[in-house]
Design a protein with these regions (language model features):
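Soluble acyl-CoA-dependent acyltransferase catalytic core bearing the H(X)4D motif
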Residues: 1-12, 31-44, 49-464, 468-499, ...
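Short secondary-structure boundary/capping segments within folded domains
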Residues: 19-24, 422-425
């Protein structure tokens, strides 16, 4: 019998799970700084714990834990944790003396290196009180198998408020909690026959609903149920692909047209990444730094250059990478390349599963002039968008491709990659990940405290020892720089260069700081 409390992980979600090793935990998070209300004398940790307890039903996926398939022969499922207790996930922590921002960053970096407990829902939150200037901090981490950047923003809307004194949120009733556990038993065979019949009755129009052929599952985690459910999925997936074939063919046709353009081969050749000191085997240690830049200054640069905020983020990242590699005498002659994630999430979609693809953009680190770098990045980013945009409609189909029997192989490959030191030998596919996620223009509050900064904390892996992720929040861009501790032990040095690089770009474009 299928239940609404069981959900199979997508291919993308499962990839994050099976790629995880001791050196490469696959969770993302944030270091959030909050300003406590004037005259506050309460216990912020207790207030936050109460808020999570009252609102956890608004984000039900936070109560799901993993149910692995027997022998890992198929993707695991999310099942509701019947023993869920919020106190196992929201905990108090203390920043040691001198309790400043640098100490907090080092502590969050150390905590980010620790993997999540797979026996429980894959998220944790730590509350740091006792910071100077009437501030507190919240470090959160959540497995990337559960969430992407777009879903993270949606989750924020549920847990955060737009005023310090919000109206009460809906409270979960016992009836509502019990209703999700009950579902009428359906005849699997007849449902499959009905789906086949529906396929031939349905006109094959662009954008057919992916759920039109959603067949029931047994929902069991025993070997027999997993095999049956995998067989059902192997029938369901081709039905969905067939129903969406016009859109798929249109996407492939657009991609082929772009690939046949005269400059396409030149564009692909420019995406080859050089080997650098950042593209090596990593340890489990992490180094983290958060830096804030003025959104107004970045937008002024975007307007002056004819680009967007994301283009300026790439130019700033390019500049600090060039500065850092020059400082350690390790700048390659060829330009570094960046992988830029792109959300495939439709507007209003708040599902927590990953819906993302991406593009590769050369960063022009071989150019000394900041303006020339910016212009090159603008041209390369536009070219890369043109190449990858036709693939956006394919993401939902690829995320559900049948994978029976492959998870175990994927895990073995991940283990081999770590133990063989292959990242020190093979050329990197890309040099760095640079991600820019819009967070919110309006201020957010949590348990009455105002969020002042939300510094993202992402993932580094073998061969990719540095990650730059940015949140646009209110009137600032909050940069989160995550690095492997054995490669960049003091990533705050790179963070400090961001301000200098912003000034250099402003000077190059004749903008007064």
């Amino acid at each position: 019998m299928s239940t609404t409390s069981v959900r199979k992980l997508s291919v993308i979600d499962s990839a994050f799970l099976f790629a995880e090793t001791t050196e490469c935990p696959m969770h993302v998070g944030s270091m959030t700084i909050v300003k406590l209300p004037e005259g506050y004398t309460g216990d912020f940790f207790e207030d936050l714990l109460k808020l999570f307890s009252e609102r956890i039903h608004l984000a039900k996926s936070l109560k799901y834990k993993l149910a692995p398939a027997p022998f890992d022969i198929d993707r695991p499922s999310w099942v509701e944790d019947e023993d869920f207790d919020v106190v196992r996930h929201v905990m108090r922590a203390t920043v040691p003396a001198p309790a400043d921002r640098d100490t907090l960053q080092r502590l969050c970096g150390w905590m980010h290196a620790k993997p999540l407990n797979r026996a429980r829902p894959l998220w944790e939150a730590y509350v740091f009180d006792g910071l100077p200037n009437n501030e507190a901090a919240i470090y959160t981490k959540m497995h990337h198998a559960l969430i992407d950047g777009g879903a993270g923003a949606a989750l924020t809307e549920l847990l955060y408020d737009v005023s310090p004194n919000p109206p009460p949120r809906p409270v979960e009733t016992a009836h509502a909690a019990g209703a999700v556990k009950r579902q009428e038993v359906r005849d699997i065979a007849s449902s499959m026959m009905a789906a086949y019949a529906e396929l031939w009755r349905m006109p094959l129009t662009r954008g057919t609903d992916m759920k039109a052929f959603e067949l029931p599952r047994t929902g069991g985690s025993d070997l027999a149920s997993v095999i049956v459910d995998a067989a059902i999925h192997n029938i369901e997936w081709p039905l969905r692909v067939a129903a969406n074939m016009p859109e798929i063919l249109q996407s492939l046709g657009s991609a082929l047209t772009n690939a046949l353009k005269p400059d396409a081969l030149e564009a692909l050749a420019s995406l080859q990444a050089p080997s650098t000191v950042l593209n090596v085997q990593i340890s489990s240690e992490r180094s983290f730094a958060g830096v804030s830049l003025s959104m107004a200054r970045v937008k002024a640069l975007a307007a002056k250059s004819g680009g967007k905020v994301n283009d300026v983020v790439l130019a700033l990242s390019s500049g600090v990478l060039r500065r850092y590699l020059l400082e350690i005498d390790a700048l390659p002659n060829r330009t570094l390349t960046s992988f830029v994630p792109i959300s495939a999430r439709e507007a209003g979609n708040v599902e927590l599963k990953n819906q993302v693809f991406g593009m590769v953009v050369p960063l022009a680190t071989d150019l000394a002039d900041p303006k020339a770098r910016m212009e090159s990045i603008l041209a390369q980013a536009n070219r890369s968008k043109e190449l990858v945009n036709p693939f956006r409609p394919l993401v939902p189909h690829l995320a559900e491709v049948p994978t029976f029997g492959t998870p175990m192989i994927f895990q073995l490959l991940s283990t081999f990659m770590g133990r063989s030191q292959m990242a020190d030998v093979i050329p990197p596919a890309i040099n760095v990940v640079v991600s820019n996620i819009f967070f919110s223009k309006r201020p957010f509050y949590i348990a009455g405290a105002e969020l002042t900064h939300v510094y993202p904390m992402s993932i580094v892996v073998h061969g990719q020892a540095l990650n730059i992720t940015v949140h646009g929040y209110r009137d600032e861009l909050d940069f989160g720089l995550m690095a492997a501790g054995n490669v960049v032990p003091h990533v705050e040095c790179i963070g400090d260069m961001l301000v200098d690089e912003l000034v250099a770009l402003e000077k190059a474009y004749g903008i007064a700081a």
